[in-house]
């Protein structure tokens, strides 16, 4: 039975109760079934009529003890769902009465409410304000707390700890009436206001305007009192200056011809908006057609800025529309992006939902560059604008139609999801708490569906739900206030949430059911990549613990195994996308997830090298090399992974090298040290030349193949926007430190590589290990 209150559920509940009463109805009334119900044991044994007296005539005449069986009444067998539904119905009706009558119903006892009903039944005409005024004296009576208000709390807790409910109930009964009215403060909630132009803005509960509105509604007779209403000002707009006009004209001149714009729009909606929502395609094409149909159109700068970003991102993913196409050139769509930046000041000044849409797309565009801080700033601007427009709250304003509400919800959950995913990837705090968001999840609205296009509403829902879990991971596992808690328990709880998310996926999103020809194939694969990434993020902190401790509890081993399997599986999904030409060299999540999983696999190779890891790394290198062709950030990730791999191969070779050869090297070193005491100049010179001087591949025995690994780092790459000479010097300096006489490479004292590391606070895992809760890649290199 559904728990939501609706007329349909009411009818179902009524029919269920009728059926239950019918099942309990006996064909013969209970009072007439005397021989079955009222016969004593003696009469029943002798099969004679019993008159039901105590004692009966038969027992009295025979001087026998007259005993009747205990009546076994059938207990009420209502289900838990029934009481939950009934409790919700009660709360809904109570809320309606409180809104209509402005009276706290829960402060009245049941006899008082019965008295109110009796009195108002005699009134021919009745106003809502008169309902409880007719029984004002009942407000002075003792006000009990109705047990029905406990609702699901009673059903779920009374079996576990009956004292909890009893204590809460007693506290409510003994509470002072004035204390019970404190929850009236909760009426001061945030609200969304819509002006005459249709622009919305959010007013939080702590704002002065919200308090003015409360005073106005509670104390004033006329709610349209002009002097107070003047406080509710609309957003002022300034006339455009010369720079603004020139920016609009430049954007209009950059609009591509219809054939090109149609191609770019198709590319954007097919690859960028697959798991998110930014703007409705039908509305976009309609407004674009209006602009193209007039010579000097009056254009909204916000929509024009959004249009430029759609064309910019469509240009980025254009190569995926033609599978045989090679990557075009660096920074595709840069002209559109630069023009959108010129328009952005006007869009910020307007602060409409178009600012939310344009700024989040700007952040996405910059994710494929090395301007990561700028990208994060655009994401923050997008979320702030969304909150300013009230997208994060449930909208009950009658001035906003249902379709607009649905589009607002879809946009909000896309912004929310992006905030969670980017915050996790960059290690930055979440921008908004879940407790502040009560906007409804998206739903399928037939009027908003596009004929001939696959609906991605379920993808938005699935991404929003897993983003919530990743947000919990950030708060509970990586939050600074949780270092004293047991992370193993937290990880297992989060892992259970992930499994529940996976079980709730609709059939067409299950990995085994995916079809490469489905328009949402890439989007659905991304859902499962995000699932694997969530496992990696929540279980990665125990990897170093696993390496440092030979003996671990089964719980730690299980979490470690989950992390390794998730990393391999994620790389296999990346390889799947690459095989079907669905891997984008400009997608942040494609290269970031590949980089994250490759780190885990390489770390596992140190302790337990296996063929599965070698295959996974081949796939990872292939994908990173492909994405590095047009993505500066991906190129950076590929460099770091190869540096990481080269060092770990050196560590493995030093640890697993030929014992005789290692002994020979130790003997030679000892001879040199002893002889140096007598003839330092004669003996130390050839020793330094043969052991410490040469840095070619032959001198790196037993790791003779290391030269090939280091050769992956080109020194003539001019497209890498970091300090190229410094990075390549770092790589050469790193290669020179790989001395075979060392059992562990000395990265800890390499100041050039320490620049990659961050200082982090440790935490206690199972009360015995102080590890790095936020491990950088250097922590994996030097476990």
Swiss-Prot record:
<dbReference type="GO" id="GO:0045944">
    <property type="term" value="P:positive regulation of transcription by RNA polymerase II"/>
</dbReference>
<dbReference type="GO" id="GO:0043565">
    <property type="term" value="F:sequence-specific DNA binding"/>
</dbReference>
<dbReference type="GO" id="GO:0000981">
    <property type="term" value="F:DNA-binding transcription factor activity, RNA polymerase II-specific"/>
</dbReference>
<dbReference type="GO" id="GO:0000978">
    <property type="term" value="F:RNA polymerase II cis-regulatory region sequence-specific DNA binding"/>
</dbReference>
<dbReference type="GO" id="GO:0005737">
    <property type="term" value="C:cytoplasm"/>
</dbReference>
<dbReference type="GO" id="GO:0006351">
    <property type="term" value="P:DNA-templated transcription"/>
</dbReference>
<dbReference type="GO" id="GO:0008270">
    <property type="term" value="F:zinc ion binding"/>
</dbReference>
<keyword id="KW-0238">DNA-binding</keyword>
<keyword id="KW-0862">Zinc</keyword>
<dbReference type="InterPro" id="IPR036864">
    <property type="entry name" value="Zn2-C6_fun-type_DNA-bd_sf"/>
</dbReference>
<keyword id="KW-0804">Transcription</keyword>
<keyword id="KW-0963">Cytoplasm</keyword>
<keyword id="KW-0479">Metal-binding</keyword>
<dbReference type="Pfam" id="PF04082">
    <property type="entry name" value="Fungal_trans"/>
</dbReference>
<keyword id="KW-0539">Nucleus</keyword>
<dbReference type="InterPro" id="IPR001138">
    <property type="entry name" value="Zn2Cys6_DnaBD"/>
</dbReference>
<feature type="DNA-binding region" description="Zn(2)-C6 fungal-type">
    <location>
        <begin position="40"/>
        <end position="66"/>
    </location>
</feature>
<protein>
    <recommendedName>
        <fullName>Uncharacterized transcriptional regulatory protein C3C7.04</fullName>
    </recommendedName>
</protein>
<keyword id="KW-0805">Transcription regulation</keyword>
<dbReference type="InterPro" id="IPR007219">
    <property type="entry name" value="Transcription_factor_dom_fun"/>
</dbReference>
<dbReference type="GO" id="GO:0005634">
    <property type="term" value="C:nucleus"/>
</dbReference>
<dbReference type="InterPro" id="IPR051127">
    <property type="entry name" value="Fungal_SecMet_Regulators"/>
</dbReference>
<dbReference type="Pfam" id="PF00172">
    <property type="entry name" value="Zn_clus"/>
</dbReference>
